[in-house]
Design a protein with these regions (language model features):
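Bacterial N-terminal signal peptides
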Residues: 4-15
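Metallo-beta-lactamase
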Residues: 19-159, 184-186, 206-210, 243, ...
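Active-site-proximal loop/helix segments of hydrolase catalytic cores
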Residues: 102, 160-230, 241, 245-247, ...
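Short, structured coil segments at secondary-structure junctions
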Residues: 107, 230-231
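Residue-level signal for inorganic ion chemistry
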Residues: 235
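A Lys-centered signature of the CheY-like receiver
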Residues: 238
C-alpha cells in the first residue's frame, strides 16, 4: 500500500510540474530573496546624476526588440496605470498587471496580476505566454510564485493579509523582477506598513514601482514610510491617469525626495546608472487615460 501511495505522490508531483504555465503555482519553493549574497555596490567615481535629458543613458528611447540591450541592462516602459513592460537582453518580456485596457504591442513571456480587477488582470490569456502569475487564489489561500526564464526571475510576496494569515482584505501581491543584477519591485495594491519579515522576504530593491492614487492603496504617509524602509534608488509612480493625481503626490513627496520628470515612457536601467540617492522619476504613460476600451 505504501509503495502504491509513494508512486501516486511521484506521479502527482510530475503532473503538477508539467502543468501549463497559466496554472497557478500554490506550493512553490521560494529561494533566496533578490540581492542576497550581492555586496552593496558602489557607483563609479566619475558618475554624476544631476540632470536628465534626451541623451542620458538612463533615458534612451529604444525599440521593443532586445537589439539595443547589452548585458547588465534592462528596458522599462510605463504602458499605463499599473502596467509596465520590462525587457531583458535575452529578449524576455515581463508585463505587470496584464489586462485588457493597457497593453503593450508585444507578446509577453511572463505576466503578473497583483489583484483581480478590470485594469489589473484578465482571463484572456494567450497560450504562448510562458508564465501567468496571479497574486491571489479563489480559495483565499496564500499564493506564492518563484519562476525563472532565461535571464529573468520573478517572485512575489502576498500582502494585505489580515487575521494572522487566516483571511484577506483586498488580497494582493508585491512582485519582484530580478535580472542583470537589478531588482525591480511592483508594489501592487499594498495597503499597509511592511514589517521587518516582509522586508526581508522582498530582499534588496533597486527600482520601486509605487501606487500613488490613495484610493485602495496606501496613504502617502504610509507610502513614504515603506519607501524609507525599502530604500530603493529610483521610485517610479503608477496608478495615475492624469496630472492632478500626480501633482498631489509630487506635492507630498517633493520635500522628502528629489523629483525628475521624463518626456519618454521608456527608460534604460543598469546598476551603474542608478541614482546615488533615492529619487522620484515621473514617466508619462504610453497609453494614458482611465476609460480606455478593452484591447482584445
Amino acid at each position: 500500500m505504501l509503495k502504491y501511495l509513494t508512486s501516486f505522490i511521484l506521479i502527482l508531483a510530475t503532473n503538477t510540474e508539467s502543468q501549463p504555465a497559466a496554472a497557478q503555482i500554490k506550493n512553490t519553493q521560494i529561494r533566496m530573496p533578490c540581492g542576497s549574497g550581492i555586496a552593496n555596490y558602489e557607483h563609479p567615481s566619475q558618475y554624476s546624476f544631476t540632470t536628465v535629458n534626451a541623451k542620458s543613458s538612463l533615458v534612451r528611447q529604444i525599440n521593443f526588440g532586445a537589439e539595443g540591450l547589452k548585458s547588465g541592462q534592462l528596458s522599462l516602459t510605463f504602458v499605463g496605470h499599473s502596467t509596465f513592460l520590462i525587457q531583458s537582453p535575452e529578449n524576455i518580456r515581463v508585463i505587470t498587471d496584464y489586462n485588457d485596457y493597457f497593453r503593450a504591442d508585444v507578446q509577453p513571456d511572463i505576466v503578473t496580476m497583483d489583484v483581480e480587477g478590470g485594469s489589473h488582470s484578465t482571463n484572456l490569456i494567450s497560450p504562448n505566454i510562458s508564465y501567468v502569475l496571479r497574486g491571489w487564489t479563489e480559495a483565499l489561500t496564500l499564493q506564492r510564485h518563484d519562476v525563472t526564464l532565461k535571464d529573468v526571475r520573478v517572485y512575489n510576496l502576498p500582502t494585505n493579509i489580515t487575521d494572522f494569515g487566516a483571511g484577506f482584505s483586498n488580497f494582493s501581491s508585491i512582485f519582484i523582477i530580478q535580472s542583470q543584477g537589478l531588482c525591480i519591485a511592483h508594489m501592487g495594491h499594498l495597503r499597509h506598513i511592511l514589517d521587518q519579515q516582509q522586508l526581508t522576504d522582498i530582499g534588496r530593491i533597486d527600482v520601486l514601482l509605487i501606487p500613488i492614487d490613495r484610493l485602495v492603496t496606501q496613504s502617502h504617509d504610509e507610502l513614504i514610510h515603506n519607501i524609507k524602509a525599502i530604500n530603493p534608488r529610483p521610485i517610479i509612480p503608477m496608478h495615475f491617469d492624469g496630472m492632478p493625481t500626480a501633482k498631489t503626490f509630487l506635492r507630498d513627496i517633493s520635500g522628502v525626495y528629489a523629483v525628475k520628470r521624463f518626456g519618454t515612457h521608456t527608460m534604460m536601467l543598469s546598476r551603474s546608472t542608478l541614482p546615488i540617492k533615492t529619487e522620484v522619476l515621473l514617466l508619462p504613460p504610453q497609453r494614458p487615460g482611465s476609460r480606455l476600451r478593452p484591447r482584445l
